[in-house]
Design a protein with these regions (language model features):
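A glycine-rich dinucleotide-binding beta-alpha-beta segment and adjacent secondary-structure elements
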Residues: 240, 247, 441-536, 540
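Glycine-rich loop(s) and the adjacent beta-strand/alpha-helix scaffold that form part
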Residues: 208-215, 227, 255-334, 548, ...
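Extreme N-terminal leader/targeting segments of oxidoreductases
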Residues: 1-13, 31, 215, 219, ...
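N-terminal Rossmann-like FAD-binding beta1-loop-alpha1 element of flavoenzymes
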Residues: 13-38
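Conserved N-terminal/central alpha/beta ligand/cofactor-binding core
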Residues: 41-231, 352-355, 362, 396-399, ...
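An anion/pyrophosphate-binding glycine-rich loop and adjacent beta-alpha core
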Residues: 126, 134, 141-189, 305-307, ...
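Helix-rich C-terminal "cap"/substrate-channel and partner-interaction subdomain
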Residues: 383-490, 561, 565, 580-581
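Internal hydrophobic alpha-helix adjacent to the cofactor/substrate pocket in enzyme cavities
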Residues: 307-314, 443, 550-570
Length: 581
C-alpha cells in the first residue's frame, strides 16, 4: 500500500460501468487531461448498449442540419414538454437539448467515434406538437473489430437471434436490401460482400468482425479509450464508496482476489445501467405481473444504487411503471438457455398482423412504439388478461416478413412449433384454442382487420395513420402500409411478454449529473449517467435511441463538470495563496 493516505491507486475520475454512458464519461475525462479509471464488474465491455440498435436521439444535431430536415430547438422543447408534462425536472431536459448537439460535435472532433443521420426515424409520439419525421436520431458507422486485436473478444455480443449465420451483423436497412437480393442486383452484391467478409472472419474469430448498431458504438468507444491509455479494470467489483467530510473521495474495489483502495480526487461516475436484470428490484418496483425476462445486460442489477444510497443519495419518485419496455417472445435454445427476442418494428407494424388479449380482442395500435405497445398490454390487463399478448397472422405473412425469431423466407416452421414458440392451425377456432383466447373474439377481430385492410382505415386504433407507423410498414401495401388481411390458412401466432430494456427509476441528479441527497443537495464528488440516473423524461420514450442519447450526453456533462471543478478549485487555491501572501 502506498503512503498516500492509505490509497493503493489515485485517479482523478473513476467510472463504474462500461456501457455507452460510462465509456463516454471516461473518454471525455481522458481528453480533458484527467487520470481516468473505468471499472467493469464483468469480463466484457458494452453493457446493454452492445446488444442494442445503438441509435442516439439528439435533437438539433449537426447531421440533422446536413439532411436539410427542419431543425428547431424550440420544437424539440415543445415536444418533450408535451410528452413529459411535468413528470420530471425540466432543467435536465434543457441541459439535454442544449448540450446534446455539442456532445456529438465534441466526440467527432476529438475521437474516431462517428455517426450518421438515421434519416427515416420518426419520433414515437406523432400525436404531439413538435414531433418530427426524422433527423433527430443518429446511428453509429460500421466498425472494424479487427482493429482491436485480441481485445475484440472483450466486446459484448449482440443478441444471438439478431445475427445471421450465428455471428454476422447487419443493419435494418441492410436486412431490407438482402431480402430483395433475389430480384435486386444491389441486394445480391451486398449479400455477396457481407457473406464473403464473414466467411473470412470465421477462419480466425468466433463471430464476424464487421460491427454495426450498438456493437459498433461500444467497440468504437472502447477503441478510443485504449488509444488514450485509459486504465480499464474488468472483473472488478466495487464494494463501497469512501465518503469523507461530505465528499466522495474514492472507493473500495475487489479485483484479482484482493481489495484495492482507489482514490478519486475529482469524483466517481455511476453508470451501472439501472436494474432491469435484478429479479429482486423488478419485483419491488415494476408493475404486476412482474416481468420475468429481460434482454438487458445481466450486470444491470442496481448495485450502484446501493453504493450511492450508502453515502446519502436518494432515488427519484416512482413513475407509472419505472421501466422502458419491449414486447418480447421467448424460446428455449438447443443448449438449454433462454432466447429473448424483442419485437421492435420488423413484424408488429407490417400489414396482416394483429395483437389480441385473452378475449381475442385487439387492444392497441400494433405499430406503435415498443414502449407504448407494452404499456398498452398492462393497461388492457387491468380489465382482461393481456399478458402475454398474442400476435396473430397467417403463413403468407411469416414467409414475407418473418415473425419474431422466424426470419422471412423460412421454408418450414415445424421446428418452431415443436419448441413451443410458434402456434399454427388450419382454422382460427383451433388457433384460439391452442393459444388460450376466446375463439369468437378472435374471429371478429380478424374479420374487422380484413375490412380495415380493404378500406385502409383502422377505425379502432388507427394503425398506419401516422408517419411512425408507416415508416415501419410496407410501402408496397395499398391503401395503408400497415393494414393487410389475415385470410389464408394456416394461421400463426406467437406470445409476447413485457420485458424491460431499461429502467426509468434511478438516482436523483441535477443538470450537472451530480447525484442528489434527500434534500436535493448535490453530493460532492458523485455523479450518475445513463439509466443509473432517474429518467429525465419521466419514464416517457420520445424517439429511437433516447436512452443512449441521454447516457452519452450526461456522461459527457459529468466528465466536463468534474474537470472544470478541478480548474475552479485550482483557481480558488491560487486566489487563497495570493490573499495569504
Amino acid at each position: 500500500m502506498s503512503g498516500n493516505n492509505g490509497w493503493h491507486e489515485t485517479f482523478d475520475l473513476v467510472v463504474l460501468g462500461a456501457g455507452a454512458g460510462g465509456m463516454t464519461a471516461a473518454l471525455v475525462a481522458a481528453i480533458e487531461g484527467q487520470r481516468t479509471l473505468l471499472i467493469e464488474k464483468s469480463d466484457r465491455i458494452g453493457g446493454t448498449t452492445a446488444r442494442s440498435s445503438g441509435t442516439v436521439w439528439i435533437p438539433d444535431n449537426r447531421h440533422q442540419h446536413r439532411l436539410g430536415s427542419s431543425v428547431d430547438p424550440q420544437a424539440a422543447r415543445a415536444y418533450l414538454d408535451a410528452l413529459v408534462d411535468g413528470r420530471a425536472d425540466r432543467s435536465l431536459r434543457e441541459a439535454f437539448i442544449d448540450v446534446g448537439p455539442r456532445m456529438i460535435d465534441y466526440l467527432e472532433a476529438h475521437t474516431d467515434v462517428r455517426f450518421q443521420a438515421y434519416a427515416h426515424s420518426p419520433d414515437y409520439r406523432q400525436d404531439l406538437v413538435g414531433a418530427t419525421d426524422g433527423g433527430r436520431a443518429l446511428e453509429p458507422l460500421a466498425f472494424d473489430g479487427r482493429t482491436l486485436g485480441p481485445d475484440f473478444d472483450r466486446v459484448g455480443w449482440p443478441l444471438r437471434e439478431l445475427m445471421l449465420f450465428g455471428g454476422m451483423m447487419v443493419t435494418r436497412g441492410e436486412a431490407a436490401r438482402l431480402l430483395r437480393s433475389a430480384r435486386s442486383l444491389d441486394g445480391f452484391l451486398l449479400g455477396a460482400r457481407l457473406v464473403s467478409r464473414y466467411i473470412v472472419d470465421r477462419l480466425r474469430y468466433k463471430r464476424g468482425t464487421r460491427l454495426v448498431l450498438g456493437n459498433a458504438l461500444a467497440a468504437s468507444l472502447y477503441k478510443n479509450l485504449r488509444d488514450r491509455d485509459v486504465s480499464i479494470w474488468l472483473n472488478a467489483r466495487t464494494s463501497r464508496l469512501v465518503n469523507e467530510n461530505g465528499r466522495v473521495r474514492g472507493l473500495l474495489v475487489d479485483i484479482g482476489g484482493s481489495e484495492r483502495r482507489v482514490a478519486a480526487t475529482r469524483g466517481v461516475v455511476l453508470a451501472g445501467g439501472g436494474f432491469p436484470a435484478s429479479a429482486e428490484l423488478r419485483e419491488r418496483f415494476l408493475p404486476r405481473p412482474v416481468a420475468e425476462y429481460t434482454a438487458a445486460f445481466e450486470g444491470c442489477i442496481g448495485d450502484t444504487f446501493s453504493l450511492a444510497q450508502d453515502v446519502g443519495a436518494a432515488l427519484g419518485p416512482p413513475g407509472e411503471d419505472n421501466a422502458f419496455w419491449f414486447p418480447s417472445s421467448v424460446a428455449r435454445r438447443a443448449d438449454g438457455t433462454t432466447a429473448i427476442y424483442p419485437h421492435i418494428a420488423l413484424d408488429r407494424s407490417k400489414p396482416g398482423l394483429i395483437a389480441v388479449n385473452s378475449a381475442g380482442r385487439r387492444f392497441v395500435d400494433e405499430a406503435s412504439s415498443y414502449h407504448e405497445f407494452t404499456r398498452a398490454m398492462y393497461r388492457s390487463h387491468r380489465e382482461v388478461p393481456s399478458i402475454p399478448a398474442i400476435l396473430v397472422c397467417d403463413r403468407r405473412f411469416v414467409w414475407k416478413y418473418g415473425l419474431g425469431m422466424i426470419r422471412p423466407l423460412t421454408p418450414t416452421l415445424g421446428s418452431f412449433v415443436d419448441r413451443g414458440y410458434l402456434y399454427m392451425a388450419d382454422t382460427l377456432d383451433d388457433l384460439a384454442s391452442k393459444v388460450g383466447v376466446d375463439a369468437v373474439g378472435l374471429a371478429q377481430s380478424v374479420a374487422a382487420m380484413n375490412e380495415y385492410a380493404r378500406t385502409g382505415v383502422d377505425d379502432e386504433f388507427g394503425k398506419g395513420s401516422n408517419s411512425y407507423d408507416r415508416c415501419n410498414g410496407d410501402a408496397r401495401q395499398k391503401p395503408n402500409a400497415c393494414l393487410g388481411p389475415i385470410e389464408k390458412p394456416p394461421y400463426c401466432a406467437v406470445k409476447v411478454y413485457p420485458t424491460p430494456l431499461g429502467t426509468s427509476l434511478g438516482l436523483r441528479t441535477d443538470a450537472n449529473s451530480q447525484v442528489l441527497d434527500a434534500s436535493n443537495r448535490p453530493i460532492a464528488g458523485l455523479y450518475a449517467c445513463g439509466n443509473d440516473m432517474h429518467s429525465i423524461m419521466g419514464g416517457e420514450y420520445p424517439g429511437p435511441g433516447v436512452q443512449i442519447g441521454i447516457a452519452l450526453t450526461f456522461g459527457y456533462i459529468a466528465a466536463r463538470h468534474a474537470a472544470q471543478a478541478e480548474i475552479a478549485q485550482r483557481r480558488s487555491d491560487r486566489e487563497v495563496r495570493s490573499e495569504l501572501s
